[in-house]
Every structure is written in C-alpha cells, then in structure tokens.
Amino acid sequence: MKIAVTSTGPSLDAPVDPRFGRAQYILVVDLESMAVEPIENPGVQAAGGAGVQTAQMVAATGAQAVLTGNVGPNAYYALSAAGLKVHVGATGTVRQAIEAYSRGELQETIEPSVGSHFGVKQAPS
C-alpha cells in the first residue's frame, strides 16, 4: 500500500508539513518496502487552488491514503472524490507519522480540519 505524507523535506526524517495544499513536499511511501518517492509540491507557489492542485497530484501517484497535519475543504473534497482516505493530526517526522498511522493512532477524518486558505495564513516565514 502506498501513502502520501506532507513534508518539509525530501526524506523520512523531515518534519511533517502541517499544511496539505502548500506542503513543501509530498512523500509517497510504499508501506511494505518503505521506498520513498519525494515530490516537490508545485502547489506551494500557486496563487489559488493549491489544495485541489495538490490533491490531483497525490491522486495520480496511486497513493491510497494521505497523512497530514491539516486539510482544508477544497483539498478534502478533492481527495475524497478520488477515493483517498485522509488522516489529519500527523506530527513529528514523516517516519514518526507513518509509525503512528501503522499503530492506528491517526484516525481517518470525515471532514476538513481547517477552513479555506489555512495554508496561506500559516506560510512559514
């Protein structure tokens, strides 16, 4: 099974990015082999629609679930429509988030966890 994790860097030891649409990287991880495919997120610089753009990119990777800190409404609905399960509340490193997911500690969400434009308001300085 492949999962997609929002990240501030290209490795499993990078911190989870709390923003979905404007995450610096999306790491696509094969849970069986722990092989990592880091993808620089083009949504970081989007003037608008970053959540939907990132959701479409993630859906195209074949991932079945997303681990992130937060997800806004447009991204959530785009991910759900593509059949991906969304898990919010991920913290620590990507590796730690995957371990928490594997232990069942990151529950699937059934709604957005933040309002529109959260990622813009939370942009790193």
Which residues does each predicted region cover?
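Amphipathic, hydrophobic secondary-structure cores in small proteins
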Residues: 65-85
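Non-catalytic interface/targeting segments
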Residues: 1-53, 60-61, 80-125
